UniProtKB/Swiss-Prot annotation:
Compartment(s) where it occurs, according to its Swiss-Prot or TrEMBL record: Cell inner membrane
Transmembrane domains' residue ranges: 35-55, 93-113, 127-147
A GO BP annotation: photosynthetic electron transport chain
PROSITE patterns: CYTB_CTER
Membrane topology: Multi-pass membrane protein
Organism: Gloeobacter violaceus (strain ATCC 29082 / PCC 7421)
Superkingdom as given in the UniProt entry: Bacteria
UniProt function note: Component of the cytochrome b6-f complex, which mediates electron transfer between photosystem II (PSII) and photosystem I (PSI), cyclic electron flow around PSI, and state transitions.
Protein name: Cytochrome b6-f complex subunit 4
Complex formation: The 4 large subunits of the cytochrome b6-f complex are cytochrome b6, subunit IV (17 kDa polypeptide, PetD), cytochrome f and the Rieske protein, while the 4 small subunits are PetG, PetL, PetM and PetN. The complex functions as a dimer.
Length: 159
């Protein structure tokens, strides 16, 4: 059923409007009280941020030196598994292919056992197994990326 404009000639709507429906009959009026308060709060926040930036600027670290990079540079924590793949795989092309396989694999996850309409994970063994294996491999690669030595990063320093 399509939406239609309310007709103000309709007696039911006229009666509701006469009883005060659709009007704020309680509290403070929006204009000018709320509008003025909103403006004061917004401008006060902007001026406060500018004052903090001017009076107490953030201290910058030492300047970057492109000829003296640290030995152990790590990306952000959410890139650890991909970083470990690139670090461990000897062939650059294979590393790029494996990195491209990650979003492709994630895009295919909804189609695994799509015919099985059960929501209980114990009744969807293939999807549950893929999820658990993916989680374990991702955690393994993420923990291994934090270890600087590549042979130790493959065994997580356990052997």
């Amino acid at each position: 059923m399509p939406l239609k404009r309310p007709e103000l000639d309709d007696p039911e709507i006229r009666e509701l409007l006469e009883q005060g429906m659709g009007h704020n009959t309680y509290g403070e009026p929006f204009w000018p009280n709320d509008i003025l308060i909103f403006g004061v709060v917004i401008l006060g926040t902007i001026f406060g941020v500018i004052a903090l930036a001017v009076l107490d600027p953030a201290k910058m670290g030492e300047p970057a030196d492109p000829f003296n990079t640290p030995l152990h540079i790590l990306p952000e924590w959410y890139f650890y598994p991909v970083f470990q793949i690139l670090r461990v795989v000897p062939n650059k092309l294979l590393g790029v292919v494996l990195m491209a396989a990650i979003p492709i694999g994630l895009a295919l996850v909804p189609f695994i056992e799509n015919v099985n309409k059960f929501q209980n994970p114990f009744r969807r063994p293939l999807a549950t197994a893929v999820f658990l294996i993916g989680t374990v491999v991702t955690m393994y690669l993420g923990i291994g990326a934090m270890i600087p030595d590549i042979p130790k990063s493959l065994t997580l320093g356990l052997f």
